[in-house]
Regions:
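Signature aromatic-anchored transmembrane alpha helix within multi-pass, membrane-resident enzymes
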Residues: 85, 176-183, 307-337
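Hydrophobic, aromatic-rich transmembrane alpha-helices
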Residues: 230, 240-263, 270
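Extracytosolic helix-loop segments that constitute the early lumenal/periplasmic catalytic or substrate-binding loops
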Residues: 7-33, 40-41
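Perimembrane helix-loop-helix junctions
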Residues: 150-183
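Short acidic/glycine- and proline-prone juxtamembrane loop motifs at membrane-interface regions
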Residues: 102-111
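Transmembrane-helix motifs of polytopic, lipid-linked glycan transferases
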Residues: 56, 60-81, 120-123
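Hydrophobic/aromatic-rich transmembrane helices and adjacent perimembrane loops
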Residues: 149, 263-311
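Specific aromatic-rich, kink-prone transmembrane helix
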Residues: 72-75, 93-96, 111-137, 158-161
Length: 446
């Protein structure tokens, strides 16, 4: 569909040709993705897309990026020196943590970079690497403008914790990397979005704004002045269900902390997932949980570390906790993904249909302005003027459109398409069926 794989596949096509992040699908007009989110991190994927310019490349890249986090995780485990028997269990737990898989269910998103970069930054800090700490901080900030929250939460943790000791000289680098850099970067990002883009997505905090109010400062004011309301807004059924789904896979270990400073790592969970009014923020089927759950994973790891080193629990008990976490995680992961196999089988049994559909869509001239059904937009990503019939021009007629391409069944109201009325407008205004049409695909030409 257009959101999000249609948007990002069209964006990568433009990046492949002129290095811009311009899309027409994201806001129904030609607009750089930088006008919506500051995400230069995407350019790290571009070389691979240039070699293999397929939509599948983006999905494969996302999976590889997310699970590449196992590399810094191995280094962290070696550094904190957990009992050797626990190392393979911790690694196995990471692989079956539901969010690491389910968050990719709606294809590529820049947030996929959060797990490896958060863990690389954590490892750089406990290793007291100066230059690489700055590097991984910048890379983390380049994911998205709100990534500064993850950096600040790490900064607050390392400022008040007593688990790791740092040289006095390194502390200056720590404060520079984890406080000065993210605050300055966020301020710059907000300025650029306000001046040249769509502005910050404050609408996702509408539940924290009074009538007539707008802006992040108003959100902060209301949070400070109305803490009980904010606290109450967290205890909705869906949010509590979300909390269960992100904590239960770790046997609630993130909550078992002797060091209160560790709870700073939960800051993004509240600011990015629970406080927002956008329902997908607290749904593990979407990409907004990558960063928060990576920090929860670190909290679980730190919990095991303190329980082991302070001899508050025997190694056998901790091994049992990790084993149970793997079982819980695997069960939740299976419940969310077992039907994915059906979709693969569905494609394989109808491969001729999908191959024919792809051939039909590729035959549409690239220089035409195309209005398409959302499911067709990834295949039409090479078109510079590509729009989704579901929301283009508020579903009104647009005379600038050259070609309309939709499933043939969309013509019939009985099939339940909300776009049927829009399609009818184009037919009534003189758009005729093209000889490019097939029995499954209806193509109208001006």
């Amino acid at each position: 569909s257009s959101f999000d794989i249609g948007i990002f596949s069209q964006m990568f096509e433009r990046m492949r040709h002129d290095f811009s992040q311009v899309t027409t699908l994201e806001r129904d007009r030609a607009l750089s993705h930088f006008g919506v989110h500051i995400s230069p991190i995407y350019y790290l994927i571009l070389p691979f897309y240039m070699l293999f310019p397929y939509v599948e490349t983006l999905d494969i890249a996302q999976t590889v990026i997310v699970f590449s986090a196992v590399i810094p995780l191995c280094l962290i485990l070696k550094k904190i020196q957990l009992p050797k028997v626990m190392t393979p269990l911790v690694l196995a737990l990471f692989f079956v943590t539901p969010v690491m898989t389910t968050s990719g269910g709606f294809h590529l998103h820049e947030n996929c970079f959060l797990p490896p970069l958060i863990l690389w930054l954590f490892y750089s800090l406990i290793s007291q690497w100066r230059g690489r700490t700055i590097l991984f901080t910048l890379l983390l900030l380049f994911v998205k403008e709100d990534a500064f929250v993850y950096v600040l939460s790490l900064g607050l943790y390392f400022t008040f914790q007593h688990r790791f000791t740092f040289e006095a000289k390194f502390k200056k680098w720590l404060y520079l990397s984890l406080f000065a850099l993210p605050i300055l970067y966020f301020a710059l990002a907000m300025f650029l979005l306000a001046r040249y883009g769509e502005g910050a997505m404050v609408s996702r905090y509408n539940n924290l704004l009074l009538s007539g109010e707008n802006g992040l400062l108003m959100v902060v004011k209301n949070v400070v002045l109305n803490p009980l309301y904010v606290l109450g807004s967290l205890f909705t059924a869906k949010r509590l269900g979300y909390l269960f789904l992100v904590l239960f896979p770790f046997s609630f270990l993130p909550l078992i902390q002797r060091r209160w400073s560790t709870y700073f790592l939960m800051l993004p969970l509240f600011l990015i997932n629970l406080l927002m009014d956008w329902p997908y923020q607290y749904d593990i089927g979407f990409q907004y949980s990558y960063g928060s759950v990576t920090l929860l994973f670190l909290m679980a790891l730190l919990s095991i570390d303190q329980l082991s080193k302070n001899q508050l629990a025997s190694d056998n008990v901790l091994v049992a906790l990790l084993a149970s976490s793997i079982i819980f995680s695997s069960a939740i992961l299976y419940s969310f993904t077992h039907n994915w196999n059906f979709e693969i089988q569905y494609y394989q049994t109808r491969k001729d249909y999908f191959d024919g559909l792809e051939k039909t869509l590729q035959a549409i001239p690239k220089d035409k302005a195309v209005l398409a059904a959302g499911g067709y937009t990834p295949s039409l990503r090479s078109h510079e003027k590509l729009y989704d019939i579901f929301y283009h021009n508020n579903k009104k007629l647009d005379s600038k459109i050259d070609i309309v391409v939709v499933p043939r069944e969309m013509q019939e109201e009985k099939n339940g398409y909300s776009e049927t009325a829009t399609l009818k407008l184009y037919k009534e205004s003189g758009y005729k069926e093209s000889n490019l049409s097939t029995k499954d695909v209806l193509i109208l030409e001006k």
